[in-house]
Amino acid sequence: MVSEANRRYFTVADDDRTAVYLTGSHIWNNLHDGMGPGGGCAEAPEELDYGAYLDFLAERGHNFIRLWRWEQFKSQAAGGDFHLCMTPQPWARTGPGAAKDQKPKFDLERFEEAFFDRLRARVAAAGERGMYVAVMFFDGFGLHLSPAPDHVEGHPFHAANNVNGIGIGSIADYQVLPLDPRVQALQEAYVRKVVDTLHDLPNLLWEVANESSGGGTADPAFAEMLGQAGTPEWGDSTAWQYWVIDLVRRHEAEMGYDRHPMGMTMQFPVPDQTKVNAPLLASPAEWISPGYDDEIFAGGGHPMAPGSPQSRWLEDPPAADGAKVVISDTDHYAPGRGDALWAWKSFLRGHHPILMDFGIIGGVNPPDPAAGGPMSFAAFEPARWAMGDTRRFAERMRLIEMAPRNDLSSTGYALANPGQEYLVLEPSGAAGPFTVTLEPGGYATEWFSVEGRNRVQGEATTVDRAAATSFDPPAALAGPTVLYLKRIGDR
């Protein structure tokens, strides 16, 4: 549940005074099998070692998984030479007849229990390790932002792939209202089945869909890259996503289930990129994952293009105001990027940082973990360890009483409960002092190196009146540093 005391954070139902801070790495195949190199499906679907994945997260101090739903049984990644031929899917493959992959067609009125068994097992296994899981009901990205023709022809709801006479031709037939009543009824049955399968697990959050369409027009060059002719009309999924949220809420209430936090994430494309997050903020969802909304991209372009400036969400995120819990996911503003400073900046601005971790596409135990390259396992290690470090600080502090207070430090990064606790980031690594405006009192001080991850205990500081107090990072700590101040004798 969202804390009434500080709506930037969740709390557990019986303890509204303890914030639940979420952070972790995620990747496309953490639920399904079938992702690997090359455009064609493998004869035997590739498997992620889920137990090793949980070990990998736990070792780095992570406590959150974005559990991916990929709806195509045959597809490829945009711009990447690898396939996503994902199995199991929620519906039984009974035939008669063969689907596009030459395996039996789907019966969309019969569930594949192996999918739901795996779904429950993975959420439960994460819970046993103290991790929360956001379960994604649907995926939009694969239906309109992955290469043609398999973006649609590799989906169970394509006419060639099922025995039920259902035939979608684009994302507009699947995630944009009004829908064919038969399609919507099948979606409703599936959503209810997912909720029935997982409702009693305490570590559960929901997500409607990853990057569904938002009513904007595709750039023709981008559409051509995907193999889609002309300017595709993808429609606006907003009303449909609100319908899914309402459906989940109604079903939980009707069945007497515990209510789990609902999330809505960035849509693409949208008519005005600077307003990309407006439907999320206006939604009935408790948590959101925003997308890039920088003015520099108002006329087109995006932060993933070569030579493009980076989004503020990566480099200088806005402070969370508590309108929604913000799970800040690099997937929506900086896929393929993320470092230690990103994690710390996001945390000190009141967000929950999670990493779209391309470094584990090949698994969490690569043959050479130290091998270099921008998408290598090693490239993302600083971000991974930093996420765990932010969590350790979050759980030491009374985070529920703290808020982003950029005005209290000359660095622009402070999370504070004035007069009690302050956590300050000096991001530049420049030699020399910075200031923190403190309330009167005595404070214990502790320094932490963002890159080296080592601590230095500082001398106690006493201030007689509210004033900007100067602090100089210890010479032993090179690079960006964190200063933790806690009132002496505080409860």
Predicted features, each with a name:
Residues 26, 461-462:
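A generic structural motif
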Residues 134-137, 207-208, 263-266, 289-290, ...:
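Short beta-strand segments
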Residues 266-272, 293-295, 331-334, 428-431:
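Short beta->alpha connector loops
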